[in-house]
């Protein structure tokens, strides 16, 4: 397995770990795992969007928006982050 595949594998591993923790409402643990996923692959859109949702669920709207805006800039089209950002703007 080459270096790039190992990095992607690690990023996906930590994303799945964070997803599992978010499902059982371990938000602090999910944040740690999702940040680690992004350390391996900053372009992991799923991890970034989930991290935004976790922040939003904790009431940290500004932190959520930061993650979603980065996600939107990485993938402008076909990105659920666009909808999340729009909902925040509509609620304001």
Predicted regions and their residues:
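Helix-start (N-cap) detector for alpha-helical repeat units in TPR-like alpha-solenoids
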Residues: 4, 11-12, 45-46, 79-80
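Conserved structural position within tetratricopeptide repeats
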Residues: 5, 35-39, 70-73
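Register position in tetratricopeptide repeats
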Residues: 23, 57, 87-91
């Amino acid at each position: 397995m080459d270096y790039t595949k190992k990095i992607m594998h690690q990023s996906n591993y930590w994303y799945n770990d964070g997803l599992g923790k978010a499902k059982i409402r371990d938000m602090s643990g999910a944040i740690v795992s999702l940040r680690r996923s992004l350390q391996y692959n900053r372009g992991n859109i799923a991890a970034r969007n989930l991290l935004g949702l976790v922040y939003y669920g904790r009431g940290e709207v500004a932190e959520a928006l930061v993650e979603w805006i980065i996600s939107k800039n990485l993938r402008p089209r076909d990105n659920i982050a666009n909808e999340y950002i729009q909902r925040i703007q509509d609620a304001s």
